[in-house]
Structures are given as C-alpha cells and as structure tokens.
Regions:
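Active-site metal-binding core of divalent-cation-utilizing nuclease and nuclease-like domains
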Residues: 145-150, 438, 443-468
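Structural motif
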Residues: 155, 471-473, 514
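Mg2+/Mn2+-dependent nuclease catalytic core
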Residues: 175-180, 479-497
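Metal-dependent nuclease catalytic cores in nucleic-acid-processing enzymes
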Residues: 184-188, 347-355, 436-441, 489-513
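Conserved catalytic cores of phosphodiester-cleaving nucleases, focusing on short active-site segments
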Residues: 435, 459-463, 471-479, 493
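Domain-level recognition of nuclease-like catalytic cores that cleave nucleotide substrates
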Residues: 502, 508-534
Length: 534
C-alpha cells in the first residue's frame, strides 16, 4: 500500500459508508466504466455541486478496482451481478489522488505539487523494486518505464481536481503549470487504463486549449449520462424513508418533509434529485434541519450576490417568496472574481448548488437552503431594503401575536414608504414577497408554508409553531379588498382545520389560532391589518 498507489483509504472509507443505516447502492456506475477500460474514450470528468456524493463515488470506484481489496465488500451489491465482476474486482493498479489535500505548512504551488510528484515516484519504486527508477525523474517518465518493462497499466481516480484553483497561494502561472502537469501525466499515455476525475467546475472553465481535451465531461445541468449516480432519486429516498420508519421509534419526519426540505434539484432529463448528505443527516437525527455546512467562500450565497446587488435585489426577494426567475444559464460558470452580469452570477450559483435551474428559470431549491438565504438577509447590510425589512421582522411577529394592528400597519407601510422597488402591488404575488421579508424572524419559531392546501381551499401563508403550545397563525392577503374580507375567507374555507386535527383526535397544537388579514388599497396606497382569534 502506498500514499497514492493502491492506497487502502478509499476502501476503508467506502466500507464505512456501506455500514451506515441509510446506504444507497450506486455501484451500477461501474457497468458503464468497465467497458471503457483501455479504450480511447476512457477519460471521464464528473462535475457536481458539493455534497452530491462525488467523493463517495470516487472512493467506491477506487475500492472496487484496486489490487488486494477484499472482493467480499461488493458481493451483495448490484455490481456483483455483472458478468465481468470477478474478472475486474481487485485486479488493477489504482492511483488515487485527492487534490484538496496539502502537505503540512504548504505555502506554494511547488510544495503542493511536489508532494504528489514525490509520493507517486516513491510508491512506484516500492511497488516495482526490480526496476531501476531514478527518483528525480518526472512521474510520467517513471510510469512509462514501468509500462515498457512490465506492460502494467494504471487506473487513475482523482477527486476534487479543481481544488487547487481556490488555494490562496496559487498564481495564474501556477494554474497553467497545474494543467500542464495533468496533461503530461495523462494525455496520450499508454499506461492509463482509465481516468476518472471529479470536481465542481468543469475543465473547460479553466482550460480553453487542448491540454485536457481527452476528457469527456458530464455536468448536472446539460448531460444525462451518469446523472442518476449523484444525488438521491425519488425511488431511492422512498426506500430510505421506509428504512427510517422501520428503525425509528418515534418518527418525526414525513416523506413530504424530505421533499420540501432537500429536493429541488434536477438532472438534465428532468428527474428530481435530493441532496444526499442532508437526507441521510435528517433521517439519522430524526430531525429536519439545515445541514448545509459551508466549506468556504465558494459555498457562501453572498459571495455571488455581492458582485451585483442592485440587479439581483428584486429577484432575490421574489425567489425567497417561492417565485422562479427567467434567465439564461451559461454552461461554464465564471469563477467568483470574474462575476459581473446577473446571468454569470446565477450560473455560478447553479454550479455550486445554491440555486437550481429548470425550464429556463432559476429558483431556491428547497427549505434547507431557504434558511441559509434568510440568515444572509438578516446579516448583510449592503442588501439595502431586504436587510432593513428582515431586521424589523421580529417586531412584526410580536405585534401580530399581541394583535397590535397599529404597529403591524406601520411596518408594512414602512416597507412601502422606503420605496422598495418591487412594490408595484399589481398583484398578491408582489405583496406576498414583502410579507415574506417582514415575517422573516418568524422562521426561527415557525415552519412557514406558502399557498398550502387547507380546509376547503388554499391559504396564502400558514405558520406552524415549532412548539405545540405556541400560537398558530393563518395569514391571508388581499389587494383592493379589506382585511375583514381576508379573515372571512379564512373562516369560510375552514383553514384552521390544519391545526385542529381530525375528528376524535386530540389537537396537536394547544395555542391560540390567529387569523391575520393584510390588505392594500391601490388607489389610496394604504395598508390595513386585522388579527382575530378563531
């Protein structure tokens, strides 16, 4: 076992994943890779947002192919039914490189790439002691020497190939040298049996030349092949949820909860995808929560929005209210320092999984990410009216619970008087976008649903308290109608049934049920609010 050659870490890491309660078998991807061995089209680059299982797949592929692996690890998985399973499992020299790893006290590209170069040469020297290897030779020359004398080939599995481009010490010249390193290591080399590479951004973003044009690239937005192997599909989440019900004493999560919180992504063919890490975390914890953990500035929503706040401000307000924004997405998104136009910014956010794209429109994928957007809105002052409204939202909630309609009206009127650009109030969609902002803090204590089926119709907003002894809120909006009309609709349509439960059942919620009506008169440009306990 070496540092890179036939390293046992991928095997051990994949075994750990397999031992988990909520494991999904994705080994059928091997059926698509095995036929490519030693063929001309044997170079694959898979790009996906973070947390979509790229590293798990890379570990699995390395664990399957590398010599000395225990074949028993895969005997109960889908790949074991493949006719070439026994012929291919555990029979190959595998070079596994995680490009996100660095040596201790790394301050330069030379130190970074030197670790990889020296480690590979050392591994090969130990694996082939019968060959006189000059440790000062380039690794591609050493590998060529091994192939010439033994005929042995190597499978390359490379994870996070683009991590180097985000390292602070890497210069533009270093980036060029890195691409040259990969070219000299892989391109046109007979010793390459297969090359499988993963990253967030595609090769074409960084290389407009021919350095790595031997790779076939597969992204989530435009390429169908391999799409089912990254992220969880509907049927896979169905199976995981059934397992959850069988093994959890007091399940707190519904199947619809998983869809609302962690769905929202799509393959190029339109199939729905779930964030795999978040689904597993939620089922393991038996709790819906925001498991989106930022791993750096490129996962930060504001990193992108800050490049053009003025153009994106209104779209952000609408997207937070659940609207979809028409736009054109570039297949190869610009890296953060280059972002200027709205299209470039949205393209980058789609690539990093912060927005999703479907049928020519971008939108916030799910409730998990909605929480990240909400936190940003309350933090970033440069967002202007969004920040101001978000930070008076706690007052709006307290006024609502106290039935203080005078304060409620003042806050809504303040939103109007600050000349929020989106407030043309031509329809209830735009009014609801602002209501989302002025009730932003309510999301800390409530699960806020918009346009949800309740009773005999659809309610504009319904606030489910996290604690069952808290007050419940039903909110209806009206343009050119009175707030009394809104409350009358809440009563007439029996929206309160959402909180009262079925006949003969004990009510889950024990607090008050408050009906809230908010209206806007286009002629007088005035708002009115009413709160009534029902």
């Amino acid at each position: 076992m070496g540092q890179f050659l036939n390293n046992k870490e991928p095997y051990d890491k994949y075994k750990t994943v397999m031992n988990g309660t909520f494991f999904v078998d994705k080994t059928e991807i091997l059926k698509e890779l095995i036929p490519a061995l030693q063929q001309e089209q044997r170079f694959f680059c898979i790009t996906r947002p973070r947390r979509f299982g790229k590293t798990v797949m890379a570990n699995m592929i390395a664990a399957f192919f590398e010599k000395n692996s225990e074949k028993s690890l895969f005997e109960k998985l889908a790949i074991a039914q493949y006719d070439q399973y026994k012929e291919q499992a555990g029979c190959h020299d595998v070079i596994y490189i995680d490009f996100s790893e660095m040596p201790r006290e790394c301050h330069s590209y030379e130190e970074y790439i030197g670790r990889i170069q020296d480690g590979l040469v050392r591994d090969i020297n130990e694996a082939y002691p019968e060959i006189a290897i000059d440790k000062n030779e380039a690794v591609w020359d050493v590998l060529s020497q091994v192939f010439d004398k033994t005929g042995h080939k190597f499978i390359f599995v490379m994870d996070e190939w683009d991590a180097v481009f985000q390292m602070s010490f890497v210069t533009e010249r270093d980036r060029e040298n890195y691409l040259l390193f990969l070219k000299l290591l892989l391109k046109g080399k007979s010793y390459v049996e297969l090359a499988y590479m993963t990253g967030v951004l595609p090769i074409a973003k960084y290389s407009d030349g021919s350095e790595l044009n031997m790779f076939l690239e597969y992204n989530m937005a435009t390429r169908v092949r391999f799409s089912e192997y990254f992220g969880f599909t509907e049927s896979e989440v169905d199976s995981l949820y059934q397992c959850y019900l069988e093994q959890t004493k007091k399940p707190q999560i519904t199947r619809e909860n998983l869809r609302e919180w962690y769905d929202g992504y799509h393959t190029a063919s339109g199939e729905r995808l779930y964030n795999p890490r978040s689904v597993v975390c939620a089922l393991t914890d038996n709790q819906l929560s925001n498991y989106w953990v930022s791993s750096g500035k490129y996962d930060s929503i504001f990193t992108y929005i800050s490049h053009n706040v003025d153009e994106i401000q209104n779209d952000l307000t609408l997207m937070f209210a659940g609207e979809k924004i028409p736009t054109w997405i570039q297949e190869y998104a610009a890296t953060a320092p280059e972002l200027k136009t709205k299209e470039e910014i949205y393209s980058a956010m789609v690539v990093y999984g912060l927005l999703t794209y479907d049928n020519g429109k971008v939108f916030i994928p799910n409730k998990e990410l909605l929480g990240s957007y909400a936190a940003m809105m309350k933090k970033e002052q440069s967002l202007g009216y969004i920040y101001r409204l978000a930070n008076i939202s706690s007052q709006m909630l307290q006024a609502t619970l106290a039935k203080d309609t005078e304060t409620m009206t003042k806050i809504i009127q303040y939103a109007h008087n600050t000349e929020v650009p989106i407030l043309s109030y031509n329809n209830e969609t735009e009014l609801s976008a602002i209501v989302n902002l002025v009730y932003l803090s309510a999301r800390d204590q409530y699960r806020v649903e918009r346009e949800e089926k309740a009773g005999k119709g659809f309610v504009d907003f319904i606030f489910y308290p996290v604690r069952y002894d808290q007050d419940c809120i039903i909110l209806e909006l009206k343009v050119d109608h009175s707030p009394e009309d809104a409350i009358a609709q809440i009563k007439e349509k029996d929206y309160a049934l959402r909180f009262r439960g079925k006949t003969a059942e004990k009510n889950k919620y024990t607090g008050r049920i408050l009906a809230v009506g908010i209206s806007y008169n286009k002629e007088t440009k005035e708002h009115d609010c009413k709160v009534e306990e029902i």
